[in-house]
Amino acid sequence: MIRLLALDMDGTCLNGRSRMTEETIRTIRKAADAGIIIVPTSGRPLTCLPYRMTQEKGLYRYTITSNGAQVVDLEEKKTLFRMLMKRERVVQFLRECEGLNVVRMTHIQHRYVMEGPLMEVAGRIVYGRDVDGIRRVNDMEAFVEKIHYDIEEVQVYFFSGRTRRKVAEILEGYPEFSSAFGSKYVEIFAKNTSKGTALNALASRLGIAKEEIACIGDSANDLPMFEAAGLKIAMGNAVPELKKKADIVTYSNHINGAAKAIEQYIL
């Protein structure tokens, strides 16, 4: 019997336009009404979770955000688990990136901090009504240097293979960081941060066994979450390595694959 359902957001519960359909939200609500603990498990910071989810009262109590950097109990308004990067070390890293043709972003105190007006505009286009948590700064290094908080995540966007290699070289000097490279950007977290580590911590706190956990995802950052779950469902649009680990491959996010999987395999 499934007691907890961990749901990735982008590429899973959201369609190709980064929107959640009525069918998807209705099916998630049906699972919650059946007593299943719904846990949004996202690479987004808390304040950028999908608007359709946040507007549904009583749909979920716990969140895993910033790829596992934070687990929050919204009812008690407290953080249950966190894995953060030291602010001073992030400042050093950002300083080393100075002069490179990159754009830098961070997740700080559950908010998405973007550097420069162009990235803010792009963020608002992508996130739509989910943008309450976006803040723009002109100089990321100066901003991080002034604050008094440790950092959930850093993202660096680059525009050439040469710059990508240079960023990778810089990261070699930060063994306390983990990183995940895409073709145009790298996500950087505290070492051992993952959706799986966070899900294990939450399940342990709630007394829920691995075989009582189901998860649905689409990306490589969902692989650790799969390791923590008894029932692993990959989207039809998922990366090949996730499909190989899945117990079930559902339809793509363009045709409400997550909703169909919940209806067929969990309820």
Can you say where each PLM-predicted feature lies in the sequence?
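Mg2+-dependent phosphoryl-transfer enzymes with acidic/Ser/Thr/Gly-rich catalytic loops
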Residues: 1-4, 21, 187-267
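Active-site glycine-centered loops adjacent to acidic/histidine catalytic or metal-binding residues
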Residues: 8, 42, 218
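Short, structured coil segments at secondary-structure junctions
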Residues: 56-59, 67, 173-175, 228-229, ...
